[in-house]
């Protein structure tokens, strides 16, 4: 009886064999192979039609279709700027103290000011404006330099101790009493106890009494005789329990020893020919927004 012929195509092997097990050389399905070729063609076509290959001088090849997401974004920004132009012109022309009486400006500054704050201010002052160590809360009404809308506007526009803006608020730094040899270490320890006492914290009574005299001789010119601070000097109230850098003994000691001198950047200053970080309308919007948070005076 003859063997029945078969038309089944034998699958080739790679020639490798191990313990009777051979490695097959099965070709890829045709549909998969043609899909692979199609992706190559698509990739080449896309790189010709659209921006694709990096170029040091101009960023990337432009593509023959001239598509640019950056240009699209710029068009959208220009469109919305044109939409808001009328209300922004009105905002710039309105006295700062009159903004709160204009419903249209109130609505605009609450929304636009919040957007500016989230973009430029939240990194330091927090998303909810509650502040961080070294960056004041804008909610509590405790203002080192004043909380009127005019003052808030000026501080945003020109900054505080910003060395680049000649119109910045030139308030004095907290001196480094140990580094500059203004006080002896024992005197610093005494005045720390006095500050703890007047801020309602546990303190060494004997050292606090000695520290009161040190305070009177060295600190009242900025913090005032009642230790409640002076806006003109940018000196904080030491009796209310609100602390910019911390109110524990170690932090107060560090502050007195090494001093403090935080910088609020100027948001209107720009180098020659450069564009300011914030426009006049944006500064007014965020100033009005901050003033409305509950801490404004």
Swiss-Prot record:
GO biological process: oxidative phosphorylation; proton transmembrane transport
One example GO MF annotation: oxidoreductase activity
Keywords, in A-Z order: Cell inner membrane, Cell membrane, Electron transport, Heme, Hydrogen ion transport, Ion transport, Iron, Membrane, Metal-binding, Oxidoreductase, Repeat, Respiratory chain, Transmembrane, Transmembrane helix, Transport
Impact reported for residue 96 to V: In strain: MT1131
TM ranges: 36-56
Effect of residue 250 to K: In strain: MT1131
Subcellular localization, as worded in the UniProt entry: Cell inner membrane
Periplasmic side: 57-297
Free-text disruption phenotype from the record: No oxygen uptake activity by the cbb3-type cytochrome c oxidase complex can be detected.
Gene Ontology cellular component list: plasma membrane
Topology Cytoplasmic: residue spans: 1-35
Family: Belongs to the CcoP / FixP family.
Subunit structure: Component of the cbb3-type cytochrome c oxidase at least composed of CcoN, CcoO, CcoQ and CcoP. Interacts with CcoH (via transmembrane domain).
General function of this protein: C-type cytochrome. Part of the cbb3-type cytochrome c oxidase complex. CcoP subunit is required for transferring electrons from donor cytochrome c via its heme groups to CcoO subunit. From there, electrons are shuttled to the catalytic binuclear center of CcoN subunit where oxygen reduction takes place. The complex also functions as a proton pump.
Protein name: Cbb3-type cytochrome c oxidase subunit CcoP
Organism of this sequence: Rhodobacter capsulatus (strain ATCC BAA-309 / NBRC 16581 / SB1003)
UniProt gene name: ccoP
